[in-house]
Amino acid sequence: MDDGNDDAITPGGDDAGNNPFAGMPLFGDLSRALSGQGPLNWDAARQFALLAASGGDMAGAMTPGGKVLVPTGNIEPNVRIKYAELAGIARLHVADVMQLTVIESDPEVATPEQWAAQTLDAYRPLFNDMATSLGQTSDDDGSNDPMMQMMAGLSKMMAPAMMGMSVGSMVGGLARRAFGVYDLPIPREGGFASKLVVVPPTIDNFAAASDIELDEMRLWVIAHEMAGHTLLSIPHIADHLRSLVQRHVGAFRPDSSAMT
């Protein structure tokens, strides 16, 4: 009699040898839930990114529907206006030094949480490539030991969630230190490629801690962001950098000998 469960969790299914919960419908459902988003669990990545970016305040960070909410207060309108004013000065300087066309739009402002969410989306293909390469297994990793087979299956099941936690924590940690998009000199694609984004709370805190006049700090950050955007908007430079990063993340391999 067909109980409605697919072959992945029944004895004799194609993955039965690698699934530690084969033949156990309840745990099979858990297995699919943990790995249901592919090589990286993006729900976990977003939640851990917001947790790290907000310094541990996850209250209200995620709704039951998964919509990202921002715990930190919005940036004041006068701060947005100030960055727009300074952008004109920075634009003239960067254009004069680089002798290239500089982006005309004013910089957007973001909280660390918003920066983290945007960065996860912008680099999603790279993180997926990295998770895929780390999730690969070689033929010589097999073992006739049932316990080793079960542990290997358990590790494979948990890998997407663990990768999501690791990636999210890393991006969230960076969000608390980043001044803008081009702190990471990695080209972004799609709609993210045309944006300048600065993080006023982090900039303000650094200026205060380093005893730097706030407008001077803001001007430096805007000039840095415009220079990075101008350079990485050159197609052959952006394509080459992107290919180098993709090659690097695609070359990762898991080391089973490290688990001894």
Indicate residue ranges for each PLM-predicted region.
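A Zn2+-metalloprotease active-site environment signal
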Residues: 47-58, 69, 142, 148-155, ...
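Post-HExxH zinc-binding segment in Zn-dependent metallohydrolases
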Residues: 164, 168-182, 231-260
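Auxiliary, metal-adjacent structural segments of Zn-dependent hydrolase domains
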Residues: 83-201
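N-terminal low-structure segments adjacent to metalloprotease catalytic domains
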Residues: 1-129
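Short pre-active-site segment immediately N-terminal to the catalytic Zn-binding motif
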Residues: 203-221
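Short, structured coil/loop segments at alpha-helix boundaries
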Residues: 72, 76-80, 144-145, 179, ...
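Active-site recognition of the HExxH zinc-binding catalytic motif
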Residues: 217-233
